[in-house]
Amino acid sequence: MSMEYLYFCLAAPIAVAILCLEDRGKQTMDFLFAGMTGCLLSRYITDFVAVRYAANAMVAAVEIAPVVEEGFKFLPFLVYLLIFKPKKEWITGDMFALALGFATFENVWNLVENGGAGIFPILLRGLGVGAMHVVCASLISIGLLSMWDSFYLRVLGTVGLFLTSVAYHAVYNLLVLSRFSWIGHLIPLVTMISVLLIRSSKNPGTDEKGNSPGTSTREHA
């Protein structure tokens, strides 16, 4: 099956949802659609660069694909921040939608291209790919949010976060293509679960007395 046919099958319902929804629902679908489109375009560019420089499959997966794919996630998100200036509470969710659109198309295409070796390997790969893209999205969105108010940190942080996400992606691809592929799929899952546990243990929505930010003691009297 052609990659373009698969893209149209997956993206068409999302395009219909974009036309029907409004406000936050529409915005989430926009980013999901952008993620799938970015995945398709990144495949074209990765294949072109690999052919241009006669790179083998390993070099393409470890040295070319991470840069191209993270670029297609990072640049639209950066433009979104600079031009539309969204509310801070929207940013992480929007980046997640972009990453999940990317991961969804990548998973389906890999299944069509390589077939399946059983439900467990397919499930492990699906969770691993999804977690890897979500971890990279979290790194970028949370990192930029924490440094956005300072111009110098914003400039340096943008470069640093992009390179870190590329390195994480490259290590994942390297392990997945080795005989330790299961370790490659487990690393982003463990990373994601660890981050969720740390966030839940800190209870960011409350202060030391259990009050929400901006809530006075008098209101609880």
Regions found by a protein language model. Give the residues of each.
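Hydrophobic alpha-helical segments at protein termini of multi-pass membrane proteins
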Residues: M1-A221
